[in-house]
Structure formats: C-alpha cells, structure tokens
Amino acid sequence: MALELIGFVPILLLLGLATIQLGIAAYAVSQAGTAARAAARTESYAESDTDGEGAGRAAMSDWMADRADITVGRGPGEAKATARVEIPSIVPGVGNFGTAERSAVMPRDEESTP
C-alpha cells in the first residue's frame, strides 16, 4: 500500500502544478481584459487627467502590470485599447507560457469627437 502511494505522489504533484499554472493563466487573461477596458474608457473621456495606458496599468495588480504592454488609439467616435500580458510561469526552467491579449472599444464623448 505504501509503495503504491509513493508512486502516485509525483503524479499528484504534477497535477497540482498544472492546475495552479492554469489558474495563473486565467488570471492573466482576466487582468488583460480589465486593463483594456480601463484604458479604453479613460481614452474615451473628453477631458481626462490621466492617459489610457496609465489607467490600464492602475487597474491591474502590480505584479501583472509589470508584465503588461498596453496600446491605445482613437478613431472617429471611439477609443480602442489593447492589453498584452505575459503569462508568468511557476514551473522552474519553463519561462514562456505565451501572452494573453484582450482588446476593448468604447464610444467617445460627444465633445471629443471630431
């Protein structure tokens, strides 16, 4: 009985690590969406004290904001923001789990449209 348990422990540890890594990846996607919405919303205001990129970073947790790349742009009647977040790895020696990317588009204020 004890021998079977010892053989099964590494499998349980790998499943636990995979589950935690999947949770971190889902959190990165959520943070990218939050940053994109906040950045687009800020860029859509006619008079704003902050820029969209700063608002996007402020909406994220600090350790994810350090890994983020946020771009904002304005079009006719709309503001668009895209946030890309590098997915961190908890597995030693494995450094790249890709990036999470989310975009958001918000209508601009009437006063700010050309």
Residue ranges and their predicted role:
Residues M1-A55:
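Alpha-helical assembly-interface signal, strongest on the long, hydrophobic N-terminal helix that forms
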Residues Y45, D49-P114:
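Short, conserved structural patches
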